[in-house]
């Protein structure tokens, strides 16, 4: 499940309690809808690990989407974890202060048993 365009791609792997989302490309006003769709498809009670290692651009629209996803997941008993952000993206997270409210880790994602749904 998800969306694909020439500048952005998202893959989702669903496990029993953890959902892995891998984003690749640019997250900006033109592509944030695809990211938002993938994030909102995840049950709020889940731990959502968003791998940002393939993202080179994170605009204000992307930051807003991440903040909203964090609030939605937290309200449902879940958690958003940002994994391996590119150095440019990590800087955006620090400058905006999002790193203070959303956990950011440098670990490689653990494999998730389950199915993988790929954006088209």
Regions found by a protein language model. Give the residues of each.
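STAS-like cytosolic regulatory interaction modules
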Residues: 1-57, 68-120
């Amino acid at each position: 499940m998800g969306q694909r365009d020439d500048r952005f791609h998202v893959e989702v792997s669903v496990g029993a309690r953890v959902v892995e989302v891998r984003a690749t490309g640019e997250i900006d006003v033109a592509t944030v809808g695809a990211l938002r769709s993938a994030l909102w498809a995840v049950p709020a009670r889940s731990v959502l690990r968003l791998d940002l290692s393939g993202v080179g651009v994170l605009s204000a629209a992307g930051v807003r989407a991440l903040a909203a996803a964090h609030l939605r997941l937290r309200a449902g008993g879940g958690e958003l974890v940002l994994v391996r952000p590119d150095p440019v993206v990590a800087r955006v997270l620090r400058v905006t202060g999002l790193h203070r409210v959303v956990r950011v880790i440098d670990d490689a994602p653990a494999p998730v048993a389950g199915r993988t749904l790929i954006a088209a």
